[in-house]
């Protein structure tokens, strides 16, 4: 991997895009390989190379890969949807959470109803061994698009973020699953 | 009115021009969305996206879409400032995990509902006298109403689906 940043090898996607020499200490080289030119093109268009350089320099080295992948995801979302970016995906997911919570509440109401109904029947010959297994979520009614609350909710899953290449982030595109509008792959 | 006030210098510059230390022109792209009394709003957007990038992105959009674009960029910039590693992707991941948990719980609850309905219907033929059961209609000893019960359950579920939830995306 270190050899990929040498001057006699091909430059990284960033230096190729910016038409400059890829130095051994290039901060982009580990995360923007030359075979993924679109990844950097999107990040550069939305965030700007100097902004990304500043952002990466402020992070610890072991955090930069996740940061680049999340920036690439957001940049691609912004390129696809210049108005809403990845906030459109967040809004879609929030509506999903809201809908599922309502369905769960209705199912729990059904369970309560049948529990009372069975006990009201007073059938002496039967052993009523009802176990109410469902556990409703703690009362986390999600306020719509509140950055502070949204991010505090995000922190428990910080360690569980997938650490693959940009390709693995394709699984995080909600409209690939829920929306039929988008064609799909990059 | 705006012209005269701007030319006279009575109007203060928008938050963007104030931060960038430049003159706020009459046709400033930022001024409708970054008022002077919200300096942090533009500061975060400038830090994450860069003023020239935001300017370019707004210029490429029709005017009636720029407000939403600014709101979403403000949201993303705030998320990135608070979490420089994951930004909005952290929120997306959290929501996806919540969906997984809710779907699992819903599947359990629905399976339990079906189980209780089947048990209730199969218990009735064994007893000739069941006048107390409120959910039974007619003579239970001669009925096998499982399919109808299933229909009832699903038709009940259909009521829960809301096609038009509130479209208010911005609550900043």
From Swiss-Prot, chain A:
One of its GO terms (molecular function) is transcription cis-regulatory region binding. Residues 10-111 form the LOB domain. Expressed in a band of cells at the adaxial base of all lateral organs formed from the shoot apical meristem and at the base of lateral roots. Induction: Positively regulated within the shoot apex by both ASYMMETRIC LEAVES 1 (AS1) and ASYMMETRIC LEAVES 2 (AS2/LBD6) and by KNAT1. GO terms for biological process: organ boundary specification between lateral organs and the meristem. Keywords: Developmental protein. PANTHER family: LOB DOMAIN-CONTAINING PROTEIN 4-RELATED, PROTEIN LATERAL ORGAN BOUNDARIES. Belongs to the LOB domain-containing protein family. Not known; ectopic expression of LOB leads to alterations in the size and shape of leaves and floral organs and causes male and female sterility. This is Protein LATERAL ORGAN BOUNDARIES. It comes from Arabidopsis thaliana (Mouse-ear cress).
Swiss-Prot record, chain B:
Residues 131-147 have a biased composition (Low complexity). Residues 12-113 form the LOB domain. GO terms for molecular function: transcription cis-regulatory region binding. One of its GO terms (biological process) is phloem or xylem histogenesis. Expressed in young shoots, roots, stems, leaves and flowers. It holds the Pfam family LOB. Residues 125-152 are annotated as: Disordered. PANTHER family: LOB DOMAIN-CONTAINING PROTEIN 4 (PTHR31301:SF167), LOB DOMAIN-CONTAINING PROTEIN 4-RELATED (PTHR31301). Belongs to the LOB domain-containing protein family. This is LOB domain-containing protein 4. It comes from Arabidopsis thaliana. The gene is LBD4.
């Amino acid at each position: 991997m270190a050899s990929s940043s040498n001057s006699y090898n091909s430059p990284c996607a960033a230096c190729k895009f910016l038409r400059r020499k890829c130095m051994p200490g290039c901060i982009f080289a580990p995360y923007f390989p030359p075979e993924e030119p679109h990844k950097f093109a999107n990040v550069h268009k939305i965030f700007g190379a100097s902004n990304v350089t500043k952002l990466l320099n402020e992070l610890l080295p072991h955090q930069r890969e996740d940061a680049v992948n999340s920036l690439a995801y957001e940049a691609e979302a912004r390129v696809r949807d210049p108005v809403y970016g990845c906030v459109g995906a967040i809004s879609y997911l929030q509506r999903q959470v809201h809908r599922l919570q309502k369905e769960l509440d209705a199912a729990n109401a059904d369970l309560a109803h049948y529990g009372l109904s069975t006990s009201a029947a007073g059938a002496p010959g039967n052993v009523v061994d009802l176990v109410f297994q469902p556990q409703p979520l703690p009362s986390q009614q999600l306020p719509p698009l509140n950055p502070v609350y949204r991010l505090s909710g995000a922190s428990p899953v910080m360690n569980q973020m997938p650490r693959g290449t940009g390709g693995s982030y394709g699984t995080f595109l909600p409209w690939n699953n829920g929306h039929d509008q988008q064609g799909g792959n990059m | 009115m705006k012209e005269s006030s701007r030319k006279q210098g009575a109007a203060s510059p928008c938050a963007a021009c104030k931060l960038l230390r430049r003159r706020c022109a009459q046709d400033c792209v930022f001024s409708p969305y970054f008022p002077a009394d919200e300096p942090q709003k533009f500061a975060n957007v400038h830090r994450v996206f860069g003023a020239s990038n935001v300017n370019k992105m707004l210029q490429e959009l029709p005017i009636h879409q720029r407000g939403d674009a600014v709101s979403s960029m403000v949201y993303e910039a705030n998320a990135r400032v608070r979490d420089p590693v994951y930004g909005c992707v952290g929120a997306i991941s959290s929501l996806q995990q919540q969906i997984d948990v809710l779907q699992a719980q819903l599947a359990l609850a629905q399976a339990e509902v079906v189980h209780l309905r089947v048990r209730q219907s199969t218990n009735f033929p064994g007893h000739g006298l069941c006048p107390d059961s409120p959910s039974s209609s007619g003579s239970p000893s001669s009925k096998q109403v499982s399919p109808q019960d299933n229909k009832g359950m699903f038709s009940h579920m259909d009521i829960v689906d809301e096609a038009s939830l509130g479209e208010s995306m911005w609550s900043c």
